[in-house]
């Protein structure tokens, strides 16, 4: 009898959710109604609330009462509450779920994250909301095309502004290191990207000095021959076919939106290597620490992002023993940044950085003064 009464209260809770009755939901929960029951369609009360924009207050109430923010519904139109809200373009509900610790990297039965669902449905506002929550980098950059010689003398004619983000991908196994992908949109208003490059299969070619060349080349090697037999056969192809094979690779050349913006280029390069910026880490790292709700899917943590950096090539650092400027890699390192105290480069390079207010090339701290050092 008690079980039948409990089930009846659970059914009444679904009715109150549909009726947008916040007080009725609180009353039933106080009387013992469960928050994780499922209806005939396999939906929890929170999933049901995340299918209608008018039920935002209901979703907020259920989360405050302790509903599982990552409850999973199986099926072709299933997933977590975040999947359901993203599929319907409910941007306010999406932000609410993310603020309560929703895991944006969970895959549904169609092997899609909520971000990919929002892209497919064309909801650019939802795409931006999720990307801003999980990205290691986002910003407007310049995409180069054409020959290097023309890029040198007329870059404005051969470059166009694009919106670029670096985000982690979804995985069935949350214990494995996260993988990153570079996503390129023609504009910030677009929901569907023009290009997606898996960074774990790509090569990042950086110039020795951003002072001489302010661009970065990303080469996608995912289409390269993988098997040993393919590698052996590739050694016998003609030179013409070899060039054709190279042309099929995705080669993306990007530069900062504002020419000479070393801070943006360093941020982008570090993000591609899986290194978050200490002053601006992805917001999902913060929410995962603040979330105490018990969930079926593990929330993201600092350890997860640490595994990203460990699974990617470590950033190249200047050899401190060679005594060369880390910027031009030519002149001796003879000047110190004040107040941070880093001996980071030659006097001319550091003076230029100081004038442009770019910050110390080592720690990004503001430079109040550059002092030349003399060896006695």
From Swiss-Prot:
Keywords: ANK repeat, Metal-binding, Repeat, Transferase, Ubl conjugation pathway, Zinc, Zinc-finger. It is an enzyme of class 2 (transferase). Its EC number is 2.3.2.27. The keyword Ribosomal protein does not apply. ANK repeats lie at residues 41-71, 77-106. One of its GO terms (biological process) is protein ubiquitination. This is Putative E3 ubiquitin-protein ligase XBAT34. The gene is XBAT34.
């Amino acid at each position: 009898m008690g079980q039948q009464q409990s089930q009846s209260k659970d059914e009444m809770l679904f009715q109150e959710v549909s009726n947008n009755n916040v007080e009725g939901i609180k009353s039933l929960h106080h009387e013992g109604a469960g928050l994780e029951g499922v209806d005939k369609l396999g939906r929890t009360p929170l999933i049901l609330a995340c299918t209608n924009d008018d039920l935002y207050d209901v979703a907020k109430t259920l989360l405050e009462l302790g509903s599982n923010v990552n409850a999973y519904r199986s099926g072709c139109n299933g997933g977590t509450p975040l999947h359901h809200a993203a599929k319907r373009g409910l941007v306010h509900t999406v932000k609410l779920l993310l603020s309560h610790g929703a895991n944006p990297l969970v895959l549904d039965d169609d092997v899609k994250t909520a971000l990919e669902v929002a892209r497919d449905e064309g909801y650019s506002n939802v795409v931006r909301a999720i990307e801003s929550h999980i990205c290691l980098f986002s910003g407007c950059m310049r995409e180069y095309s054409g020959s290097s010689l023309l890029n040198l003398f007329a870059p404005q004619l051969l470059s166009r502004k694009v919106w670029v983000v670096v985000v982690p991908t979804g995985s069935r196994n949350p214990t494995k290191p996260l993988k990153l992908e570079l996503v390129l949109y023609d504009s910030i208003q677009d929901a569907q990207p023009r290009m997606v490059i898996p960074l774990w299969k790509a090569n990042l070619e950086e110039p020795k000095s951003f002072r001489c060349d302010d661009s970065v080349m990303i080469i996608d090697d995912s289409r390269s021959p993988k098997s040993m037999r393919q590698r052996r056969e590739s050694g016998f192809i003609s030179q013409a076919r070899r060039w054709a094979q190279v042309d099929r690779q995705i080669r993306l050349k990007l530069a900062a939106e504002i020419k000479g913006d070393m801070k943006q280029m360093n941020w982008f390069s570090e993000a591609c290597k899986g290194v978050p910026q200490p002053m601006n880490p992805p917001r999902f790292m913060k929410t995962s620490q603040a979330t105490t709700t018990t969930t079926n899917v593990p929330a993201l943590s600092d350890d997860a992002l640490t595994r990203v950096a460990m699974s990617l090539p470590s950033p190249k650092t200047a050899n401190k023993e060679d005594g060369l400027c880390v910027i031009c890699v030519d002149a001796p390192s003879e000047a110190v940044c004040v107040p941070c105290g880093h001996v980071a480069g030659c006097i001319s390079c550091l003076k230029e950085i100081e004038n442009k207010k770019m910050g110390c090339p080592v720690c990004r701290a503001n430079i109040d003064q550059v002092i030349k050092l003399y060896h006695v």
